[in-house]
Amino acid sequence: MEGPFLALSRKGAHDPECLKDPVPEYVDRLLHAANGCLRQITIAPELPHGIDAIRRFAAAGVVPAVGHCDADYATACRGFDAGAGIMTHMFNAMNGLHHREPGPIPAAVEDPRVTVELINDGFHVQDPMVRLGFGFAPHRIAFVTDAMAATDCPDGHYLLGALDVNVIDGHVRLASNGAIAGSTLTLEKAVQRAVLELGFTPTDAVEAATLIPAKAFGFDRANPVTKQPLGLLAPGYAADVLLINPAIWAVEHVWCDAHLLR
């Protein structure tokens, strides 16, 4: 879940009228409404109640993520120490790297407990920065898409919630101000780009879409949510399998729980 506990200065395409400080009442109401179904929530740790909210969500079994923030290095470190285990789409919607104002990115990559998300579409994050991210945090990068409803659809005009967006060349921007408003990326394409365009090993590319995100939620071992562990082709793991054409890195067949779906 992204929002509503985000920094106004890094809101991206989020409606500023909906942004809130995560006071205990809001946290408790959200946890009650989710009824155990909330897995991850992005929080700007510099908000007045940001660190306390991270602790509260973590104590409830939710994985807090640092993102959509303008946090300095020390505040981001406090967020991770309080229980945040993920950085939401690194480089996007946060203050960037600076040698005198390091910000949240070094805090995430220095902490071995933190899984670092990346949107590998060549647009949200340019290829040199994707490679830099993998160098920063080897075996801790998780591919995410930030995809919205126009994914796998033609270019044109769409709605993102109540917001008008335009999709041009597969890139999504708000019609009002041109701000990036999600993506049309699929995980298949993210892995494909990593291998064919960035030169990553198949192991590193596939791991970023499977085992690493599974580890972030504790799904790489027996757990009450998925029951069988996820993320590997190994005895005892869920029989969820993709068959990929190695020449073009496109998915050809899909099995879920050992049943052929495609």
Annotated model-derived regions:
Residues 248-254:
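Short, Lys/Arg- and Gly-enriched loop/turn segments at beta-strand edges
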Residues 20-24, 44-47, 51, 98-102, ...:
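Electropositive phosphate-/nucleotide-binding environments in soluble metabolic enzymes
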Residues 257-258:
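Glycine-centered positions in the ABC transporter ATPase nucleotide-binding domain
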Residues 103-116, 134-147, 151-244:
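His/Asp/Glu-enriched, well-ordered alpha-helical/loop segment
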Residues 25-155:
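Active-site core of metal-dependent hydrolases
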